[in-house]
């Protein structure tokens, strides 16, 4: 049986777009192994949202002149690519940008949507320099991962301009390893992982999802016979939840619109289905982060339920044993 050190992770700094994490203790060499793996997953394999096509009234292609604006169409498109969007519903769709008159146009001028949130509304897009200027733009928003080059086909309508899309929500990842000792053991090390995001995902959520991807990929390498034996030996544990609470629609929990949309997109419509998923599986849902999880846990507590009923049952059993033991001693 392996006697390798089992590490723990702690977040030592976080501001929504930046997170610093320390993983320790690790056997010598594991810091680089883990750091490299997490870095590659973070930068390349997390889902994100990006603008993929643009339609501008009066503009046929990217080399057309943009009337009554200081920027040309190419510069405008380059600025549009920097808009960072979070999908609240987990769906693709269209955003609309409308402006008129002489003004500085920013991402804040994009019309509000129930399905999307622009996380950098202060982003500069262009300047209209005439009082009679009118700008109408449609932005196609898609889900994906990594980077995708512009896609133009014979069926692309005239006036639709494809743009290269950067889906990854991660801007930068750094990691370092440091030597450490625990007691007399001096051959251990710690991993320091720094993550910068674009604001559409929290650093802690990004690290959690990346680790989950790695676990699922490595699970395929586990002995097939061992997996089958464990599955056959395990029996499902059922927890008694009143039927009226089990079948309660998630809307009755008074969750935020964002949390409800994330759950419904994953096919979760009742409180019972939420509890069946559990904490770990919920955190793998698209756009369902730690804030949504905390909100959900708080709402469940108000109706006397928990995302981890097995832990509560264990605690109740332990408390009961201690109580009975105290009575016996008395």
UniProtKB/Swiss-Prot annotation:
It is an enzyme of class 2 (transferase). Residues 1-225 are annotated as: Alpha N-terminal domain (alpha-NTD). The keyword Iron does not apply. InterPro entries: DNA-dir_RNA_pol_insert, DNA-dir_RNA_pol_RpoA/D/Rpb3, DNA-dir_RpoA, RBP11-like, RNAP_asu_C, RNApol_insert_sf. It catalyses: RNA(n) + a ribonucleoside 5'-triphosphate = RNA(n+1) + diphosphate. Homodimer. The RNAP catalytic core consists of 2 alpha, 1 beta, 1 beta' and 1 omega subunit. When a sigma factor is associated with the core the holoenzyme is formed, which can initiate transcription. This is DNA-directed RNA polymerase subunit alpha. The gene is rpoA.
